[in-house]
Structure formats: C-alpha cells, structure tokens
C-alpha cells in the first residue's frame, strides 16, 4: 500500500477527509490557483480550438501536470502539517491505515 493510499483510507475512515478537502479547496481559491488553472484551460482550448475532436479527457491530461506544479509550496506544507496533526491526534485510536 502506498503512503497516498494509506492516508486516503485513514482520513476517510476517521472522517477527516472532508475537512482536508475543504481546507485545500479554500487555500487554492485564496491563493488564486483556481483562476490560474481556469486561464490555463482557456489558453489550451484556444490553442486547440481548430481540433474539433479535442476531448475533456485530453484537456484534463494536458492540464493536470501543469496545474499540480502551480500549487504553492505554502499550501502543500499546510496540508502536510494538517495530515500529520490528524495522524498524531488519532495515534491511539483503533484505526490503522495498514489494515484499511
């Protein structure tokens, strides 16, 4: 099991997944990331406009790596701290991400 999968299952089981998603969503909005990605999508669509067969899946494939690189380090760090805090708070609980 990867660390990502363990964290994902643990946060889902502990009920903290929604809190983490809400935190990430609000921080990405606050820092302007959503607007940057929206502009990136528009730019790609204008560039590919002549290609009528350009699909949503192709757009997502092209945008995803660039969008991930645009996430500010401060947001990544805050999210990591939040996840570590959740693990520390639940350390004594019966939820074991390896058993999930």
UniProtKB/Swiss-Prot annotation:
It is found in: Nucleus, Nucleoplasm; Cytoplasm. GO terms for molecular function: C2H2 zinc finger domain binding; chromatin insulator sequence binding; TFIID-class transcription factor complex binding; transcription coactivator activity. Its main location: nucleus. Involved in mRNA export coupled transcription activation by association with both the AMEX and the SAGA complexes. The SAGA complex is a multiprotein complex that activates transcription by remodeling chromatin and mediating histone acetylation and deubiquitination. Within the SAGA complex, participates in a subcomplex that specifically deubiquitinates histone H2B. The SAGA complex is recruited to specific gene promoters by activators, where it is required for transcription. Required for nuclear receptor-mediated transactivation. Component of the nuclear pore complex (NPC)-associated AMEX complex (anchoring and mRNA export complex), composed of at least e(y)2 and xmas-2. Component of the SAGA transcription coactivator-HAT complexes, at least composed of Ada2b, e(y)2, Pcaf/Gcn5, Taf10 and Nipped-A/Trrap. Within the SAGA complex, e(y)2, Sgf11, and not/nonstop form an additional subcomplex of SAGA called the DUB module (deubiquitination module). Component of the THO complex, composed of at least e(y)2, HPR1, THO2, THOC5, THOC6 and THOC7. Interacts with e(y)1. Interacts with su(Hw) (via zinc fingers). One of its GO terms (cellular component) is nucleoplasm. PANTHER family: ENHANCER OF YELLOW 2 TRANSCRIPTION FACTOR. This is Enhancer of yellow 2 transcription factor. Coiled coil: none annotated. It comes from Drosophila persimilis (Fruit fly). Keywords: Activator, Chromatin regulator, Cytoplasm, mRNA transport, Nucleus, Protein transport, Transcription, Transcription regulation, Translocation, Transport. One of its GO terms (biological process) is mRNA export from nucleus. It comes from the Eukaryota. The gene is e(y)2. Belongs to the ENY2 family.
